[in-house]
A protein has these predicted regions:
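Charge-rich, N-proximal long alpha-helical rod segments
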Residues: 1-53
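Structured alpha/beta interaction-core segments
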Residues: 51-141
Length: 141
């Protein structure tokens, strides 16, 4: 009788441990799905950020009310990105890192160090610890 109680107790403990592992695994999967979904949304919004930056770069009259309004909307968008954990990748002056940067050009430059980024063509971004878009850069050899 004691043997049967011990066996059933052991089975119950195993079942509880198995269920606990299942719960932890599903929580982890759910969190991962959220990050993947958010990353996809951020990726789809990056061309909008690029358009804002290109448009604002062409404005010569900073007193123009329309340009000021667009600047405010851009800043609001970038603040929201920052609060969500979306960060621009530092590029110019940094050492080339293939995990963060995509080298599209190489240049011989004695003034720049070996494998140092001298120009950024398109800004890259990370969301949490994931690269959403690599920076497109020119690297010195």
């Amino acid at each position: 009788k004691d043997e049967k109680i011990e066996e059933l107790t052991d089975q119950l403990k195993r079942q509880m441990a198995e269920f606990d592992n299942y719960r932890k695994r599903t929580e982890k999967e759910k969190a991962s799905m959220y990050v993947i979904g958010a990353r996809d949304i951020v990726e789809k919004m990056l061309p909008i950020v690029d358009s804002f930056e290109r448009g604002l770069a062409t404005v010569s009259d900073s007193e123009d009310p329309f340009a000021q309004g667009m600047e405010k909307v851009y800043k609001q968008l970038m603040t929201a990105f920052d609060e969500l954990g979306v960060k621009p990748i530092e590029a110019v002056g940094q050492e080339f890192n293939p995990d963060l940067h995509n080298a599209v050009m190489h240049v011989e430059d004695e003034n720049a160090g070996e494998n140092v980024i001298v120009e950024e063509f398109q800004k890259g971004y990370t969301y949490k610890d994931f690269v959403v878009r690599h920076s497109m850069v020119k690297v010195a050899n």
